[in-house]
From Swiss-Prot:
The chain crosses the membrane at residues 12-32. Belongs to the ATPase B chain family. It is found in: Cell inner membrane. This is ATP synthase subunit b. CDD domains: ATP-synt_Fo_b (cd06503). GO terms for molecular function: proton-transporting ATP synthase activity, rotational mechanism; proton-transporting ATPase activity, rotational mechanism. It is a single-pass membrane protein. F(1)F(0) ATP synthase produces ATP from ADP in the presence of a proton or sodium gradient. F-type ATPases consist of two structural domains, F(1) containing the extramembraneous catalytic core and F(0) containing the membrane proton channel, linked together by a central stalk and a peripheral stalk. During catalysis, ATP synthesis in the catalytic domain of F(1) is coupled via a rotary mechanism of the central stalk subunits to proton translocation. It holds the Pfam family ATP-synt_B.
Length: 160
């Protein structure tokens, strides 16, 4: 009986131990495990959402990058067009300035030519008057007249 009482005591203590574990240890462990499983599943769902959100944001970033490239190309194209327009305007202005300078130079040349021509005419007329005066003064001697005329001709030819 001693053996039966021991087995009975051990059975009772085991049942009490199981009951105690079920009441105070098992359910808190199970609730902690379930809570952690719920957190893990929530974190997995959150990670999945974050991954899809990341893919969406990445796609939006790529789209924005493409749009920025297109816009940059348009800006470059407009800048090149503006550059060409500025170059053409500068070329046109340079041509106008060139023609203005050339016309001023031509006018200056014409003016100088006219001034020099008038001055030469004046000098020639003075020389003719001077020569005529000398011829008249020396008209007595015919030979002197010929020498004077030759001198005048030589003088005129040296001044040209």
């Amino acid at each position: 009986m001693n053996l039966n009482a021991t087995i009975l005591g051990q059975t009772i203590s085991f049942v009490l131990f199981v009951w105690f574990c079920m009441k105070y240890v098992w359910y808190p462990f199970i609730s902690i495990i379930e809570k952690r499983q719920k957190e893990i599943s929530d974190n997995l769902v959150s990670a999945t959402h974050a991954k899809t959100e990341s893919e969406r944001v990445n796609a939006e970033a790529l789209l924005c990058l493409r749009q920025a490239r297109v816009k940059a190309q348009e800006i470059i194209k407009q800048a090149n067009k503006c550059k060409m327009q500025i170059i053409n305007e500068a070329k046109h202005e340079a041509e106008k300035e060139q023609s203005r300078i050339l016309s001023q130079a031509r006018e200056q040349i014409i003016y100088e030519r006219k001034r020099v021509t008038d001055e030469l005419r004046k000098q020639i007329s003075e020389l003719v008057i001077e020569g005529t005066e000398k011829v008249i003064e020396h008209s007595i001697n015919e030979m002197i007249d010929i020498d004077l005329l030759n001198n005048i001709i030589n003088t005129l030819s040296y001044k040209d």
